[in-house]
């Protein structure tokens, strides 16, 4: 029994000391089936470039890991549209065979490899014939799945918290530590809905930010083109108001949030698209609960009466959220620090004048309880007060 106990203890210690797998992409050898002139672009860590292959059987790359090592997994990041892809290894007869594949639902995906894999292919999933537009390919060596390997869950069937925002990076600039606290620390289903899809590289930066903040549910984007204005009226000249209302009402019904957050009615620094978000939410809270409004989404999802809605910088029923409390899920970092890390994932925005700030005129810790079906906040330090 003593020997068995010692063996068990050693086994547990070995696993307790397991380290996250390292990115070994730069050390691997690659043999692309097509598109060799652009293949380097899927390893340059630049989200504005991509590797384009031919269609069909030549849509693959063979990967050989460094001698004496093995690969544990692969992450792909796609340009503009998700792609159904998979990993292949050779069987006993030397034939390439499927070792796992995706359905092509997400712009960033991770697949594990069979233990001890030293040579494999990244190729189309069975039945997929399209060419690759692959922005980044990342190969991971031996070890546990690394924290940056994005393994998205479907968009929430029932959201605890929903953010309706205009652009990529708004989720941390104006909402601070909300996602790190509620998604990362408390494990709540947090659904982010965005009006402007923006450029493909910004969507990948956005996913990096959400993943850094602990969000697991895949976001959704509408298709409104980006256009700057300083007024609500000018914004609605570019975007059809009824289409915006229809979209936001459908999101509310589809995701059924307990708590909904959105932009300042004045658009923070005045951005018309931010104003649209606030205006649409204020209108659609009632519409989403009315079966006679936008009958298509009412039939598909039913109606939904949102229990609580907070608007950034709303002057009534003010809550001042403390984003400076340490979070165990992030090793003691505060939600503010994690939000800052998330914003740094928006690499293309680092030379702008925007910063994550829980102070000043656009303080991202200040919100007003615009609507409640569960009574007023008393403690005023938790969006889920009276709901938990």
Q: Where are these predicted regions, by residue range?
A:
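Bacterial N-terminal signal peptides
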Residues: 4-14
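Disordered, acidic Ser/Thr/Pro-rich linker "stalks" and the adjacent N-terminal cap
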Residues: 17-71, 78-85, 91, 98-101, ...
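The feature marks non-catalytic terminal segments
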Residues: 19, 28-41, 152-153, 182, ...
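Extracellular carbohydrate recognition and processing domains
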Residues: 96-113
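Active-site rim/loop-helix segments in enzyme catalytic domains that contact anionic ligands
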Residues: 111-254, 282-286, 290, 301
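Active-site environment of divalent metal-dependent phosphoester hydrolases
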Residues: 170-174, 198-200, 267-272, 317-320
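Proline-aspartate-enriched helix->loop->beta-strand connector
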Residues: 244, 248-269, 277
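Short Gly/Thr/Asp-enriched flexible loops that form oxyanion-binding sites at enzyme active sites
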Residues: 269-285
